[in-house]
UniProtKB/Swiss-Prot annotation:
Mg(2+) 2 binds at E274, N276. PROSITE patterns: ATP_GRASP, DALA_DALA_LIGASE_1, DALA_DALA_LIGASE_2. It comes from the Bacteria. Its cofactor is Mg(2+); Mn(2+). Belongs to the D-alanine--D-alanine ligase family. Keywords: ATP-binding, Cell shape, Cell wall biogenesis/degradation, Cytoplasm, Ligase, Magnesium, Manganese, Metal-binding, Nucleotide-binding, Peptidoglycan synthesis. Its main location: cytoplasm. It is found in: Cytoplasm. It comes from Pelotomaculum thermopropionicum (strain DSM 13744 / JCM 10971 / SI). This is D-alanine--D-alanine ligase. Binds 2 magnesium or manganese ions per subunit. Its EC number is 6.3.2.4. The gene is ddl. ATP binds at residues 135-190.
Amino acid sequence: MTLKVGVLMGGRSSEREVSLKTGEAVYNALKVKNYLAVKIDVGLDVVERIKEERIDLAFIALHGRYGEDGTIQGLLEMLDIPYTGSGVLASALAMDKAATKKIIQYEGLPTPPFMLVEKKEALKESLQACSERICREMGLPLVVKAPTQGSTIGMSFVHKEEDMAGALELAYDYDPVALVEQFIRGTEVTASILGNEEPVALPLIEIVSATGVYDYKAKYTAGMSDHIIPPRIPEKQQNAIKKLAVSTFKSLGCRGLARVDFIVDKQGNPFILEVNTIPGMTATSLFPDAARAAGIEFPDLIEKLVELAMENCGIRRR
């Protein structure tokens, strides 16, 4: 029997356009592999659409809120439909950069020093006074992030104290808490992880942005960033990063796939920045490049993710 796979894409988050590109690429790959595939643009009628299509498995190609945060995973659990990627808890934890940082810190894994600043507390203190205090306590430069956003949405780099208030306001447009992190200069490296109970790290990628910052434009515009495989760091450091990435994957309880982003400082020390449980699968995305470097072409990668989802389903239902 041919497996019918529903590609869940689009959605309602700020990353809708990226999700549509990922979904289209996944859909085409499934067709190449002779799966019976159907595209489902996730909206308020998603339950009706899923039931109507009578899918055997959901391939989650959603990014951001409602797709990566455990929401759609919980819905699929209730509908008893197998799905690709991490479960409810791991998805929710990885989507919240603040929660991820706390777990990484608890596990004793390296991550840049950080501070969580609640909007209500910042406004009570006054945004200006809060900004001055943050810069005084943490020093400059800093990175301010909206914890639950992806694709660098709501993120700012702060090099001057007078820019901190605006950075906080931007983060608060998306979340009630801002994650303020020490900005570490160095080499950006990402580790793509594939597997369930025995995950493996694919070849590492060094990211070099044309603008110096791997922002939304650099991520999704052809020619705006270079993916260097292998990274221009010693093999010993590469192996250490791979081990850290797998440890992070396991600590959060991820499965199927994830991408762990690092910064390597000038002394060669790696720091974990964040975890992405549904990495982009567009023409400019990192995960497919890492798979290709490991000898896995895109259609084969997509089929492998379907197989991992079915394997996990079997594990859960023993």
